[in-house]
Amino acid sequence: MKLTGDDGREYLDFLAGIGVCSLGHGDPAVLSALEAQTKKLMHVSNYFYIEQRGQVAALLSKLANDDVDGARVLADAIVAGDETTAAALGVPAAGEQVWETFFANSGAEANEGSMKLARLYAKRAGNGGNTIVCMRGGFHGRTLETIAATMQDWLQDSFRPLPGGFVACTPNDVDELRAIFKQLGSEICAVMLEPIQGESGVHPMTEEFMAAARDLAHEVGAVLIADEVQCGIFRSGKPFAFQNLWRGARHHEPCQGHCRWRAHGCRHGKEGDCRRV
């Protein structure tokens, strides 16, 4: 999309609001939906259910299962205003993995929620640990907690002392990751990473490293958090980038189901894990 600066020059927008404007700017369908909603309710707290939020959550659950065709049919029904069909399609099929969604206001808030959920899970149903392993060169937000998880000195130095409970690992260094787990074991409640790092450059995780992260987390009862603000929503060809990178992992034993990730200001988790906390 072309944007015009205050100097009158035209620019091609490849920034997309630092990765969050996945639908572009001024799309007629988006504007129409916004106008229609503002005539009803401007804001509804997460304490309450509204059907549109439920529809989007069902859509995201299908995408999380890599069911693109099912998501497309559901999306068409939602856009067409066919509430009956949308409601029917939103009901999970027998054996379908259900992913629950918590909607947030920003990526940093969603990331903080994921870290809080990981620690809460560890206390209530997991290993009781509170340490989160994060990748050097990653970026997870600008709150104090997410800066602590962002393992880049030039971003952290101005804000020290930072919250504790975070350990740095070099991306794709399986030996270092194993050494961290050997040293800390059940003190670890989560591994947090971007499947493809964005802020520090385009640095994808390898299948081997993703498999190791998931399997090591499984062994100690920890969770895996994938931050997909920069790489999610089909930017890698799949609905979410982690789906390209888990082909080498143990699909029959998916880290006890304890996987959460977030993209564009929302957080997702497998249904059973969310209900445990």
Per-range role (PLM):
Residues M1-V277:
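Conserved N-terminal phosphate-binding loop of PLP-dependent enzymes in the Aspartate aminotransferase
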